[in-house]
């Protein structure tokens, strides 16, 4: 979608098939992720994840409920996931070890001057977006 610059993903860090630890992968036939992908560049990304999500574990690892080939769907740690996206979009520094700012229960990890942002929503699960204040979301969209 060439006309879309801002992307928002809610409770959806990379899964273990989309990134193998080295490369992004394209979904193929029968959900096989074998072809190396080059994700979009020149875009802005906001990811929102809850620390208490039983379906998509914040710290990575297999979902307790989402099936996948060979068992349960594995996920990449949410903070690692946004770091991988930031590197793909042009970030050359180290992974952030702490939040860039804190807004209540939300820790904000910001890369590339706010073009790649992760909201770590503490004490929330798969409903993490419900904890967002409209102003915090608009702040990302306005930049």
Residue ranges and their predicted role:
Residues 45-48, 75-76, 82-143:
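C-terminal catalytic histidine-bearing segment of alpha/beta-hydrolase fold enzymes
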Residues 6-95, 110-112:
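The feature captures the conserved acid-bearing segment of alpha/beta-hydrolase catalytic domains
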Residues 4-5, 138:
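Hydrophobic core segments within long, regular secondary-structure runs in both alpha-
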């Amino acid at each position: 979608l060439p006309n879309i610059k801002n992307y928002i993903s809610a409770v959806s860090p990379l899964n273990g098939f989309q990134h193998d630890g080295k490369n992004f992968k394209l979904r193929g036939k029968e959900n096989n992720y074998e072809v190396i992908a080059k994700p979009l560049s020149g875009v802005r990304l906001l990811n929102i994840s809850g620390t208490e999500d039983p379906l998509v574990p914040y710290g990575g690892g297999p979902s307790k409920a989402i099936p996948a080939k060979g068992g349960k769907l594995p996920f990449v740690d949410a903070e690692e996931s946004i770091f991988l996206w930031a590197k793909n979009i042009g970030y050359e520094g180290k992974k952030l070890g702490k939040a860039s700012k804190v807004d209540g229960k939300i820790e904000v990890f910001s890369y590339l001057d706010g073009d790649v942002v992760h909201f770590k929503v503490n004490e929330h699960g798969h409903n993490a977006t419900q904890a967002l204040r409209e102003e915090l979301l608009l702040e990302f969209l306005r930049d």
